[in-house]
Amino acid sequence: RDGQGVYTSGDGKWTFDGAWVNDKRQGQGKMAEVSGEYVYIGPYVNDQRHGPAVVQFGDGSVFRGPFVNDVQKGPGELTFKDGRKITGEFLDHMPNGQAVEQSTAGTLNGVWSNGMLNGKVLVTYPNGTRFEGMYASNKRNGIGTDFLSDGSREECNWVNDVRQSPCVRITPDGKRIEYKAPPARRN
């Protein structure tokens, strides 16, 4: 194959619309699964996805970012149908490294690994309160501090998104109040 054209895979599961050179995809092209679950629009080099691209998923989400030698990696942006957006480092369309997630519920800024928060995270809520602490496998785990709108802060240990007692509330004037935390409380 040489030149511009549309190719359908032998099993009928995907199509490619773009340029061919010596039977290899080369230049701008569009590869789409017939099911609609995955559509890649971007450049090909020597039959591999390579360069800045847009990927549309069947659930309505859209990824924008680079591919290198047929692997998606580097800075990108993933926008979901509900308006939620993740911007930062990606690997295989998942946040991997430093990234920020923005939604109507607030902003999560932290370290991601294979699409999950793992490490230090700062969560800022629309009402101005914020949480700083550690996450493991997308859940709060370890010491975390909630900074409240009245100027006080609450320090607790978390296990799988559940506060562990005792917790300490520190008022704006520095008074420390130890208390038993209700389970799974969120701001």
Ranges and model annotations:
Residues 1-187:
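Glycine/tyrosine- and acidic-biased, solvent-exposed loop/turn segments at the edges of beta-strands
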